[in-house]
């Protein structure tokens, strides 16, 4: 799968010309680099270690976080951060690049931690979303950052620096629409919340619905069952699983 960006940990200072501009990079500095300009750093690879991030990792990170979207006039091609515990970061990157990386959940948390170093940087979200390969993917990632927000087509266009007519055209080429992407994202989030949240009112609110009754209508139309029915099915599945586990334990004794 294609890389979206890389996090680079500089262990030896160097000077470089990136995109026709001279830069001085310091020992211990951390960079997030758009994959489109990654080749500009290749001549200096002996000065740094890095970890790459593919589209799936970026999508999941954006879904799991709640970072506000901030538009910037010109999308950054790389971001810089400092005052990071370099010893810890060095060990994290070494582990993520090693063959010992066999604990998926732990590795994923480390990857998310590397990305979060840049969360306060202006242009962070723009860099990530611009790296997602499809237009529908970019829209989905923006929506997933805050599903409770009353998203409008104009909001998405502002984030992507694109006109409403052009965005509609591009989404049509990918056989989808903004409304469909928003609905799918909210319904999937609702289905996940039902596993842990008992209040339909709260779920509706967290998914961006001002009206609980309309949320229930939309959920039933999307999944064929009401939220309460799906919640009950999940509880039954958990109960059955627990009983099976207890039976197996008793047999083992």
UniProtKB/Swiss-Prot annotation:
Residues 154-175, 200-223 bind DNA. InterPro entries: Homeodomain-like_sf (IPR009057), HTH_AraC (IPR018060), HTH_AraC-typ_CS (IPR018062), Tscrpt_reg_AraC-type_HTH (IPR020449). Residues 137-233 form the HTH araC/xylS-type domain. Gene3D superfamilies: Homeodomain-like (1.10.10.60). Pfam families: HTH_18. Induction: Induced by EvgA. It comes from the Bacteria. The keyword Transcription regulation applies. SMART domains: HTH_ARAC. Keywords: Activator, DNA-binding, Transcription, Transcription regulation. One of its GO terms (molecular function) is sequence-specific DNA binding. Induces the expression of gadE. Could also regulate the expression of other genes involved in acid resistance. NCBIfam families: PRK09940.1. This is HTH-type transcriptional regulator YdeO. The gene is ydeO.
């Amino acid at each position: 799968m294609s890389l979206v960006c890389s996090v680079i940990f500089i262990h030896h200072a160097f000077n470089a010309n990136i995109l026709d501009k001279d830069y001085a990079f310091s020992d211990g500095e951390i960079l997030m680099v758009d994959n489109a300009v990654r080749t500009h750093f290749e001549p200096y690879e002996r000065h740094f270690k890095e970890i790459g991030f593919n589209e799936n990792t970026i999508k999941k990170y954006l879904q799991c976080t709640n970072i506000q979207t901030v538009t910037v006039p010109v999308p950054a091609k790389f971001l810089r951060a400092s005052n990071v515990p370099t010893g810890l970061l060095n060990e994290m990157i070494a582990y993520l690049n090693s063959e010992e990386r066999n604990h998926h959940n732990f590795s994923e948390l480390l990857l998310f931690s590397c990305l979060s170093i840049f969360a306060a940087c202006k242009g962070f979200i723009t860099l990530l979303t611009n790296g997602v390969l499809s237009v529908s993917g970019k829209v989905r990632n923006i929506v997933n950052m805050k599903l409770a927000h009353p998203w409008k087509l104009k909001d998405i266009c502002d984030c992507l620096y694109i006109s409403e007519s052009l965005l509609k055209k591009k989404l049509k080429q990918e056989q989808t629409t903004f409304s469909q992407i928003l609905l799918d994202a909210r319904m999937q989030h609702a289905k996940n919340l039902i596993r842990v949240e008992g209040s339909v009112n709260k779920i509706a609110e967290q998914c961006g619905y001002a009206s609980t009754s309309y949320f229930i209508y939309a959920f039933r139309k999307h999944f064929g069952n009401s939220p309460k029915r799906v919640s009950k099915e999940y509880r039954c599945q958990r109960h059955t699983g627990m009983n099976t586990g207890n039976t197996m334990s008793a047999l083992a004794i």
